[in-house]
């Protein structure tokens, strides 16, 4: 089995980030696994990344806002 390297920075130095799309509300997170960008839409996954990588540093108020938007 190959090792999975979960991180918030890929080889080109572009960091993962929370994002919001105006118009139709859209919240999520972008991160990198083995240098490949992935988009994450589920808040539980975002929280999982937060537990694995504390430097993601998502505030509780942001988590609540994301949760609210995803229930729409």
From Swiss-Prot:
Stated consequence of mutating residue 37 to A/G/H/N/P/V: Complete loss of enzymatic activity of PlyC holoenzyme
InterPro entries recorded: Endolysin_PlyC (IPR048849), PlyC_sf (IPR053769)
Pfam annotation, one family: C1_PlyCB
Molecular function in Gene Ontology: identical protein binding
Phenotypic consequence of residue 60 to H: Complete loss of enzymatic activity of PlyC holoenzyme
Tree of life domain: Viruses
GO biological process: killing of cells of another organism
Site feature location: Interaction with the host cell wall: 29-30, 37, 60, 67
Alphabetically ordered keywords of this record: Antimicrobial, Cytolysis, Host cell lysis by virus, Viral release from host cell
Misc remark: Part of plyC operon, which contains plyCA, lil and plyCB genes.
Its biological purpose: Component of the endolysin PlyC that degrades the host peptidoglycans and participates with the holin protein in the sequential events which lead to the programmed host cell lysis releasing the mature viral particles. Once the holin has permeabilized the host cell membrane, the endolysin can reach the periplasm and breaking down the peptidoglycan layer. The small subunit PlyCB is responsible for the specific binding of the endolysin to the host cell-wall, probably to the rhamnose of group A streptococcal carbohydrates.
Oligomeric form and interacting partners: Homooctamer. Part of the PlyC holoenzyme, which is composed of 1 PLYCA and 8 PLYCB assembled into a ring structure.
Name of the protein this chain belongs to: Endolysin PlyC, small cell-wall binding subunit
Species assigned in the record: Streptococcus phage C1
Taxonomic placement: Viruses, Duplodnaviria, Heunggongvirae, Uroviricota, Caudoviricetes
């Amino acid at each position: 089995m190959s090792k999975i390297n979960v991180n918030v920075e890929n080889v080109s130095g572009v960091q993962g980030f929370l994002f919001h799309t105006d118009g139709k509300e859209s919240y999520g997170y972008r991160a990198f696994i083995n240098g490949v960008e992935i988009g994450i839409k589920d808040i539980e996954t975002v929280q999982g990344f937060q537990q694995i990588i504390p430097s993601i540093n998502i505030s509780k108020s942001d988590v609540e806002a994301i949760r609210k938007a995803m229930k729409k």
